[in-house]
A protein has these predicted regions:
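Phosphate/NTP-binding elements of NTP-utilizing enzymes
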Residues: 1-244
Length: 244
């Protein structure tokens, strides 16, 4: 029987220490020098600690309640009432009772984007990072919506740790073809560019033409198909050729 070897769950910290600091929500996002782990949790609490390529990564603590209506990842249907809204300006024109109805839904989407999301996968509570959630739930790719892949989940967890660790300059990722990396990278570019002000995010490829194709065929469609509450106010065309 196959046993995965991409990661292992380790216990480098006493459970009593984890519980004590969880109670006061003292675990800070980033590298923890005292325990030599990288915390990717943004809730102040941690749960399992993964060892990926000798990189010790502390995940968020598993919540007590996880939706168990499905046994695998499923994309949540975007409410029809919100599909009609194209920009924040349209949203402002709606009555207050409409906004009050949908604000909890929108707040939850922002929370998942920031903290990540737990779901039931073959009977197991499974965590995905906020970036991975944005890719699976809100990114449009050539076949529609991306599939959930365990290898991608680990990739995004490792990538989140690289972003969290002040010692890190990034990651080197050796990939095979047709792994979905171009779409994952495009999704991350859009995700980061739409939550950080006064920042520039570029695309590097083996040629300028290939970089432009990635922008027009992958980055722009993902951006265009974001729901209105994730779209920043922008000037110019919806489908530009060189920059958003």
């Amino acid at each position: 029987m196959y046993e995965q070897t991409l990661y292992s769950v380790i216990s480098p910290i006493k459970q009593s220490t984890i519980s004590r600091l969880n109670k006061s929500k003292k675990w800070s996002y980033g590298y923890n020098k005292e325990h030599d782990i990288v915390v990717i949790s943004k809730t102040g609490q941690i749960g399992e600690i993964y060892n990926i390529q000798n990189f010790k990564i502390a995940l968020p603590k598993q919540p007590k309640k996880i939706n168990k209506t499905t046994d695998k990842w499923t994309v949540e249907e975007y409410p029809k009432e919100l599909k009609q809204i194209k920009s924040v300006f349209d949203w402002r024109d709606y009555p207050d009772n409409f906004k009050e109805k949908w604000e909890p839904y929108i707040d939850e989407q922002f929370k998942r984007r920031e903290e990540g999301h737990w779901f039931n996968n073959r009977g197991m509570a499974t965590y995905i990072t906020g970036t991975h959630y944005m890719y699976l739930q809100w990114s449009k790719i050539d076949v529609g919506k991306p599939d959930f892949r365990e290898a991608n989940r680990l990739f995004f967890i490792f990538w989140e740790a690289c972003k969290a660790d002040v010692r890190s300059y990034g990651m080197c990722y050796l990939k095979n073809r047709r792994s979905g990396f171009s779409f994952m990278a495009s999704g991350e570019v859009v995700n980061l560019a739409t939550i950080n002000s006064d920042s520039r995010y570029g695309i590097l490829s083996k040629s300028g033409a290939d970089a432009k194709t990635m922008f027009t065929d992958k980055v722009v469609p993902i951006s265009v198909n974001y729901p209105f509450f994730f779209k920043p106010i922008q000037d110019g065309m919806d489908r530009p050729k060189t920059e958003l």
